[in-house]
């Protein structure tokens, strides 16, 4: 890490350096290479899941709760995941959140049982979802014939 001096504005005020910035819902970290933090995404995912599970709880069937998880909570967790580089630890921390929700739905303490239930109910793992979203993003980006994209590709 570099220890840089603060930037001084024309009116003499000092701008300090930040370790992260939140832009369009993505937290970008101060690092040597582009990386994102998923702490806020996980918190929003847990908040959404707990709100839904608190309302329907054990009244609704597992099918309904899994469908709500897939349609309402997972998009929160996966927001802009296609543009953020994912490390193995990022994938495992996001998968842990989903597995924890499935464990709560099926009232189990076993990750293996939760993963099997998720698979049987059609909840794909984070790695697969991220790859699908990234491929779709790149195909959509490639399909658009924009000057900016052609310029970026030529660099």
Segments predicted by a language model, with ranges:
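Non-catalytic, peripheral interaction segments enriched in hydrophobic/basic residues
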Residues: 1, 21-137
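C-terminal helix/juxtamembrane-tail motif
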Residues: 140-155
């Amino acid at each position: 890490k570099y220890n840089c001096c603060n930037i001084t504005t024309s009116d003499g005020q000092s701008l300090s350096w930040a370790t992260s910035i939140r832009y369009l819902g993505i937290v970008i970290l101060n690092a040597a290479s582009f990386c994102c933090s998923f702490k806020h995404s996980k918190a929003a995912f847990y908040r959404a899941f707990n709100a839904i599970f608190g309302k329907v709880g054990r009244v609704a069937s597992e099918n309904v709760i899994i469908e709500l998880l897939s349609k309402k909570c997972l998009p929160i967790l996966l927001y802009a995941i296609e543009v953020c580089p994912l490390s193995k630890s990022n994938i495992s921390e996001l998968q842990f959140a989903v597995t924890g929700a499935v464990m709560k739905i099926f009232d189990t303490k076993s990750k293996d049982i939760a993963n099997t239930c998720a698979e049987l109910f059609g909840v794909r793992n984070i790695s697969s979802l991220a790859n699908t979203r990234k491929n779709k993003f790149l195909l959509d980006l490639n399909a658009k014939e924009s000057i900016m994209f052609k310029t970026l590709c030529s660099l």
